[in-house]
Amino acid sequence: MKIGNALQGAGVGLALMLAATTAGQSADLGAKDEPIKLAMLEWTGAHVSTHIAGQLLEKLGYKVEYVTAGNFPQFSGLADGSLSASVEIWLNNVGDIYPKVLAAKQIEDIGKLDLKTQEGWIYPKFMEKVCPGLPDWNALNKPGCVQALATPETAPNGRFLDYPSDWGSRAATILADNNMPYTAVPSGSEGALVAELEAAEAAKTPLIMMFWGPHYALAENDVGWVTMPPCKQQTNDHCITPPDVDKIVWSGFGAKWPAAYTFLKTFKMDATEQQKLMLAVDKQGKDLDAVVKEWIDKNEAVWKPWVDGAKG
């Protein structure tokens, strides 16, 4: 009887330990039945980063929703919790809302994505004959160059192809700061930007435009980067420098989804890898989810430490 009681007691103790362990694991996941809402921004690189993060969060046991959001408007959603996280925030282009909600501690910056970036003004390389002196920005001010870039829409100014208006851009401000005779004309979308670059390359049509890397188009088109004019003020509104890219979450994220929070803090994106996936989606027409799943299947050595670390 004593032995039986001892075994029974041990069994109860083991059951309690297992229950406590299971409860601890559930607590680490937090509100796993409530979806984590990831911001889906306008550019393909962000789609890639976001879907890799999302599929890995699902491996951790979370439900994930992808919510379309504008680059500036997303910060209102992150501040009020209607968006949970955004994993590819280019800090040189965050607008006026971001610093306010960050200072108010409505959002939290959880670190670098480690994405090696480029941003600035590009041109097809044949433009160096149209505007002698490129890549020096002063070459753009020469009358012959301005005339070559002028269109009926912008004459007598040259046309500068800018980001879509809802992305936000500093190009118009920098042009004005330096009294450059150009009118910034917003593009309709990322696809329209790339299409115009490719058309200019094919037809040798003069073009100067705002662009960024990593991007698959940079691997397929011969472009130069303008050596930028001086900054009137050392701020994001008046300067273009290779930007840092951070990950941002709603301020309540860590308390609500602890393991997801740990995972996103360690999540990284390699620019070369991202560019390969963008090429597959944008040029080869492959499905985004399928491309991301294939990458995850082939790169367990990359992401497994992030997931294992989040499990604790």
Where are these regions (language model features)?
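Immediate post-signal peptide segment of exported/extracytoplasmic ligand-binding proteins
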Residues: 23-37, 57-58, 149-157, 302-312
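Short, well-ordered beta-strand elements
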Residues: 30-45, 62-67, 157-160, 264
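An extracytoplasmic/periplasmic, membrane-proximal ligand-sensing/linker region
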Residues: 32-36, 45, 166-183, 187-204, ...
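Short helix-initiation/N-cap motifs at beta->coil->alpha
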Residues: 43-44, 62-77, 185-196
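Pocket-flanking alpha-helical
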Residues: 50, 69-105, 196, 216-221
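Ligand-binding pocket segment of bilobal, Venus flytrap-like solute-binding proteins
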Residues: 83-88, 159-232
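A conserved helix-loop-strand patch within extracytoplasmic ligand-binding domains
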Residues: 106-160
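A bilobed periplasmic-binding-protein/Venus flytrap-type ligand-binding module shared by bacterial periplasmic
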Residues: 118-130, 242-256, 280
